[in-house]
Amino acid sequence: MMQPTILLLKDGTDTSQGKAQIISNINAVQSIVEIVKTTLGPRGMDKLIEGNRGATISNDGATILNLLDIVHPAAKTLVDIAKAQDDEVGDGTTSVCLLAGELLKESKNFIEEGMHPQIVTKGYKEALKLALTFLQENSYSVADKSDGEKREMLLKCAQTSLNSKLLAHYKEFFSEMVVQAVETLDTNLLDKDLIGIKMVTGGSVTDSVLVKGVAFKKTFSYAGFEQQPKKFANPKICLLNIELELKAEKENAEIRIDNPDDYKSIVDAEWELIYEKLRKIVESGAQIVLSKLPIGDLATQYFADRNIFCAGRVDAEDIKRVQKATGSIVQTTVNGLSQDVLGTCGMFEEQQIGAERYNLFQDCPHSKSATIILRGGAEQFIAEAERSLNDAIMIVRRCMKANKIVPGGGAIELEISRLLRLHSRKTEGKVQLVINAFAKALEVIPKTIADNAGHDSIQVLNKLRQKHALESDQSKNFGVDINAVDGIGNNFENFVWEPIIVRKNAFSAATEAACTILSIDETVRNPKSEQPKAPPGGLRRGGPQGMAGLAKNARLGK
């Protein structure tokens, strides 16, 4: 007797499973890796991506992957690990994608030959544990160095980060600016939110300035603003989250009165309410008033007559930074406004920078902060420069916290690769092959840097393997030197340094991503569920909502 067909999934559902599915996922990841591969290293190329948000020029792995509309579910894993690397460390986003792709490429041969994915996963996790141990053993501590040596180390780490960016030609100028900005912060917290980057179109890149305090662009102002003072020493600062303007009547508003004098009393009461608010602010002793909400022309003129500076519609992020830097507390009412909630700074002034005017709060006593005002020509250039500086700031912060560095340019990857190969000889079974594959995958970093710089990567890798095989304290620091004729150099002596946390995070994230993709053996997709849904509350034929909509349209005369 024939067994009836049992349908478990909706009609049209696509299911893929088994070895073919794993291979398909690996191929999808490989195609994404090929896109970002050419952006790695000091000679990496940029990508021009045009989408709904306009044209974007970038060579930052996380930015590129975020702008690409990737639909393959397995390939989206790369976007996640690049974003995690960017959020956690700030740099190494392309490296982590390349490493994950290479680990999957190496595992593809094992899967095709019949090795179980869990054996590959186990081998990769064991290799990762060894790699992190070797990473610690081959790092250099700077905790016992002098302040001058530490600062030099921070400058070199910032320059290494900027080497592969659009600002590579100005790395000395911007690395000094970045280190100064991070040094301004409280050394115990190193809160990145207290460093702001403001972009001003026009002028040269070298016209960029560092403000040791908070700076933001002058907001929209009403008549009377010109009469307000633009410079204060040790001012009292009041932060508000209330409107200080007369509200217009709402459309179709209705007031029922028996006597025309009643209307005058209503208007007078409204004026009295706003004047009462303004009086309380003045009585508190505030000399600078900032609000997230509008400050109207009446309030602007009132403050100008009393030598008080005011600015409304200030961005929430800028208010937050001013609050942290000056010690002010944002108020949602002016009732009970006292000296306790007012902040202060050493100097406040409004300055012209390029075509814009900026409000500068300097010498802030409570929480030290800094603002980089970035200049440049094209908007796309400034936007990419801002992303580059963000990466460098994150790197310097991490360096100050970790106090350990490793040589860059693929040097540490080659040394760990050599040590893993030696260790694999002592390992039994199939795991030995997987550890060897992990060691080979690490070589993708120096290989790609050499390729992107125009060197013969095969020759460069052979020379580097020979150097690292000498097992000396100097030879282990050899990596790709794009300026050398033979393509190799001692990257520790060449000051190509990276914080250990960048490599540690990259190895861990790439391995986790590879293991996650290898553990997926089935994908279930329902094309119908991916179709755009009708907006909620739409017209439904014969339904109550549909009738209500028709009735409303009839009232409006549609």
Curated annotation (Swiss-Prot):
Protein name, per record: T-complex protein 1 subunit eta
Cellular component GO terms held in the UniProt record: chaperonin-containing T-complex
InterPro entries on file: Chap_CCT_eta, Chaperone_TCP-1, Chaperonin_TCP-1_CS, Cpn60/GroEL/TCP-1, GroEL-like_apical_dom_sf, GROEL-like_equatorial_sf, TCP-1-like_intermed_sf, TCP-1_chaperonin
Chief localisation class: cytoplasm
Family to which the UniProt record says this protein belongs: Belongs to the TCP-1 chaperonin family.
Keywords: ATP-binding, Chaperone, Cytoplasm, Nucleotide-binding
ATP-binding recorded as keyword: yes
Its biological purpose: Molecular chaperone; assists the folding of proteins upon ATP hydrolysis. Known to play a role, in vitro, in the folding of actin and tubulin.
PROSITE patterns: TCP1_1 (PS00750), TCP1_2 (PS00751), TCP1_3 (PS00995)
Gene Ontology terms, MF aspect: ATP binding; ATP hydrolysis activity; ATP-dependent protein folding chaperone; unfolded protein binding
PANTHER family xref list: CHAPERONIN
Localization terms from the record: Cytoplasm
